[in-house]
Amino acid sequence: MTTHTTFPKALIVEAVPDILSRITSILRGYPDIELAFLFGSFAGGTVTAESDVDIAILCRQTPSFDRREEIRAALCAGMKREVDLVDLNGASPILRMQVLKKGIIVIDNASVYEDFFVRTTGEYDDLKRVRKGIEESILRGGIGGAHA
């Protein structure tokens, strides 16, 4: 049986600067990382004893599997906690938008951020329009359903 302990919000708020500092220190060793965000439970204040650290990175070029694992291993060692590392180069518009909305910037590059923001919001808006059309069609019974 696993028990989930939610830490008091005050402890999380006090710990966030230390967490951000450690993440920044580790990621500065990887000059190909142009943007990085802390997101998920640590950014949202819902950390439990079992929570991993969710970090999203944007590199100049899509990092290889080995490179991502190297970065993730360095973060795990430095954070002394499991890290879920997301490559924003290959992430869905939905995940990228969640990172933009709820994430905390750890590594910032203003021009790269602006390009990432414009691309992500554009793709997300396109996806919402397509999804809305599909949902309306399904409700009318138009996709695989009986037509009224």
What are these regions (language model features)?
Residues M1-L35, A43-G45, R60-A148:
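Catalytic core of pol beta-like nucleotidyltransferases
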Residues D54-I57:
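Short beta-strand->loop micro-motif that forms the acidic, two-metal-ion catalytic signature
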Residues F39-S51:
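Short edge beta-strands and adjacent turn/loop segments
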